[in-house]
Amino acid sequence: MNSSLLPPVRDLTAVQARVRQTLDKGVQIDLSTESCKRFLRRRVNQKVGVVILYVDIDGSTKMSMALPPDKFATILHVFSQEMSLITSEYGGYVLKYVGDAIIALFPAEYDSGQASKNAVDCAKDMQRIIKECVNPELIGRGLPQLTVKCRSTTAMCKSCSMARV
């Protein structure tokens, strides 16, 4: 992948410093999906166009078997944090975290082409951040580097209200 074609990330040095701090001290941000829930609640009983981005760590099952649980959990924390931050930078919402994956929504209510572009650009930046910021820090600590798979699709969904039990 030609990184010169990718949109610029504001400050890779700051991203790498945050990754380093997360490896040392744990997650540095709120990883809740509350903003996505608010987005969906405002659209209860409406059909909403979205682009769905699915991002996961390639080979994570083997990695989870080879690493001590605390090391694997730390890698998942870094991955989840950095992918979540990039998602929000591109106007997306994290719908949920599923093991080693993140499912994100990009609203396509007004411009599905722009939503698709945002999701694709987000995926490109995710690849770049993994390659240029996350992997050097992991390798420096004797941990395996990550390869990330990204897939997207466009959908119409209907948000419905679910009563709390």
What would you call each of these model-derived segments?
Residues M1-Y90:
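Juxtacatalytic helix/coil linker segments
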Residues M65-A66, N118-A119, V165:
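Surface-exposed beta-strand edges and their flanking turn/coil or helix-capping segments
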Residues A73, H77, G113-V120:
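Non-membrane alpha-helical structural segments and their capping/turn regions in soluble enzymes
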Residues Y90-A115, V134-V165:
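Catalytic core of nucleotidyl cyclases, primarily class III adenylyl/guanylyl cyclases
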Residues M126:
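Serine endopeptidase catalytic core focused on the charge-relay Asp
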